Amino acid sequence: MKTFIKGLGQVALLFLFARFMNLIVEVLHINIPGSILGIIVIFALLHFKIIKLEWIEIGALWLLAELLLFFVPSAVGIMNYGDILAEFGTSIILVVLISTFVVMVSTGMLTQLIAKRKERKKTCSSDA
């Protein structure tokens, strides 16, 4: 029960943070969605150890676990645009598949590059 309440508080904190980032974007007229700005700011706060991972970890893990649930309204909403899907459906699916493939390949290559650099660093520090 304690973990549930802690997770609920963390989800509320993340929600408030997201709303705050949307407000910042609106007030400052920034051409970046509030959610993207929020991700960047959360990453920076975690990276520079201004906030601790434990402060948001349980809530973030729950949100990730339930991510599919958040796409259901979007998928249902698409059904209102059957005429557009009939005309551009194949193109949309092709773009989604290609962009997914590009993201997967680039993520894999970047991960391998980072792993190699870490291994080189580890080897260099153990040789010294």
Swiss-Prot record:
Signal peptide: none annotated. Its main location: membrane. Keywords: Cell membrane, Cytolysis, Membrane, Transmembrane, Transmembrane helix. GO terms for biological process: cytolysis; killing of cells of another organism; programmed cell death. HAMAP family: CidA (MF_01143). Belongs to the CidA/LrgA family. CidA subfamily. This is Holin-like protein CidA. The lineage of its organism: Bacteria, Bacillati, Bacillota, Bacilli, Bacillales.
